[in-house]
């Protein structure tokens, strides 16, 4: 028996090692389709986008921008996933978007001012926005476009992926022709980037009301961004009282109190869900056959979209697309469309697109799952609201319900399992607490 256990352990270790080696050798498309592998994008300063594939999943490998600098060549690499493994000799560092204190002092000692010159290249990165140079005071008054920034204070810290927070020194003059037809979202303003293109930036005064980690997060309707206190990561959670859905904190002793944590019991338009308790990151919905079903929350932790510039979302075939959008870069999760009433460019949220008229009208169809990467044992489906949703595979080996969060109960019938829908290979049984529980029908190995 011991030999059998040892042999099984060796086979498992060999399989894990083989999976890791397999990920490294996969193409980008193959890596996206393999649930055991994580696709990672990275690039050097002003370089082209590159790709690598590592073993892991999106529960442990989160999208986050990190900057690495070589101690020998001073080369810089920007990666967008925390599981990226840099080459030997590369270390983490924080870039600056204004003159450093040393550069300010150096220029001041020469009787000059420090000008932060942004890198002039086709593919700039937030890890190497530019550098400080010393120039005479009267030279900057003639202006040199938006690629120069006069600094009178220390550095303003690194840029956030998808957004740029302008410092107190500003980012230079804004040409009128680039921002004239740009209408930014609330809390943003239009500026011109180093390529002369209009860009919507977060207002500096908005920082006090929005966590920094949420600045590059676009949530679905009826959700908002919060920072997890334990991990420090940003994630989308349900609003306390979205239309037609109310979450209930079962542990609260105050009547009518609510909570936005996962695993909530949903009430509102569907009475059948009033006493159904779903696992974390799931909510209750009534199926067409009248049964209650726990459905994965949109954009739950572990649900990610690929791509760097637009979070992997593809702009729909829109009406009114014209030259007013040619110089507009919208924030991640948004696309540009001409407003027929004002003639200006609107940055619209992908999730707000409808099939009717108006500013957000669209034609054609969108494959909402085309760039969605789901966790292991999950697949992407288009739900009845038209959103991409990661749904559990009904026949995935290893998929099971939690002993505590997998409990469901119903009212209106003596049979607690009458309106409970379990995955394939699971059946509903009444447990010792009198609640319906989804129990596996498979025989353990």
Curated annotation (Swiss-Prot):
Function, in words: May contribute to the structure of the coat at the interface between the middle, cellulosic layer and the outer, electron-dense, proteinaceous layer.
Top-rank taxon, per record: Eukaryota
The entry's keywords: Repeat, Signal, Sporulation
GO annotation, biological process: sporulation resulting in formation of a cellular spore
Protein name: Probable spore coat protein sigD
Domain Follistatin-like: 178-201, 213-237, 272-295, 324-348, 368-391, 416-439
UniProt cross-references to InterPro entries, sorted A to Z: Dict_spore_N, Fol_N
């Amino acid at each position: 028996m011991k030999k059998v256990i040892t042999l099984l352990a060796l086979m498992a270790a060999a399989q894990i090692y083989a999976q890791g080696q397999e990920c490294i050798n996969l193409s980008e498309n193959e890596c996206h389709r393999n649930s055991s592998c994580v696709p990672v994008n990275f690039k050097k300063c002003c370089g082209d986008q590159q790709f690598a594939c590592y073993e892991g999943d999106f529960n442990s490998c989160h999208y986050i921008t990190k900057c690495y600098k070589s101690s020998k060549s001073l080369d810089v690499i920007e990666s967008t996933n925390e599981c990226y493994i840099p080459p030997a000799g590369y270390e983490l560092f924080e870039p600056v978007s204004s003159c450093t204190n040393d550069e300010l002092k150096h220029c001041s000692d020469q009787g000059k001012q420090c000008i932060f010159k942004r890198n002039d290249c086709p593919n700039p990165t937030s890890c190497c926005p530019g550098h400080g140079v010393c120039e005479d005071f009267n030279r900057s008054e003639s202006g040199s476009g938006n690629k120069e920034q006069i600094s009178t204070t220390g550095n303003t810290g690194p840029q956030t992926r998808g957004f740029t927070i302008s410092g107190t020194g500003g980012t230079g003059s804004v040409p009128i022709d680039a921002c004239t037809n740009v209408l930014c979202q609330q809390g943003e303003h239009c500026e011109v980037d180093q390529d002369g293109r209009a860009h919507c930036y977060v207002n500096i005064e908005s920082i006090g009301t929005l966590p920094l980690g949420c600045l590059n997060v676009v949530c679905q309707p009826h959700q908002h961004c919060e920072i997890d206190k334990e991990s420090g990561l940003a994630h989308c959670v349900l609003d306390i009282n979205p239309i037609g859905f109310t979450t209930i904190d079962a542990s609260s002793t105050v009547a009518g109190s609510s909570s936005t944590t996962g695993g909530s019991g949903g009430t509102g338009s569907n009475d059948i869900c009033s006493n159904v308790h779903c696992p974390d990151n799931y909510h209750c919905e009534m199926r067409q056959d009248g049964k209650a079903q726990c459905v994965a929350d949109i954009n739950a932790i572990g649900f990610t979209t690929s791509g760097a510039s637009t979070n992997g979302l593809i702009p729909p075939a829109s009406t009114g697309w014209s030259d007013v959008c040619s110089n507009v870069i919208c924030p991640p999760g948004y696309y540009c469309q001409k407003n027929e009433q004002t003639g200006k460019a609107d940055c619209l949220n992908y999730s707000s697109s409808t099939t009717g008229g108006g500013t957000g009208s669209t034609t054609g169809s969108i494959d909402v799952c085309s760039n969605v990467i789901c966790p292991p044992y999950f697949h992407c489906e288009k739900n009845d609201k038209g959103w991409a949703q990661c749904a559990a595979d009904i026949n995935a080996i290893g998929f099971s319900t939690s002993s505590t969060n997998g409990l469901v109960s119903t009212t209106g019938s003596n049979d607690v399992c009458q309106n409970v829908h379990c995955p394939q290979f699971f059946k509903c049984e009444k447990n010792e607490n009198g609640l319906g529980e989804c129990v596996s029908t498979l025989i353990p190995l």
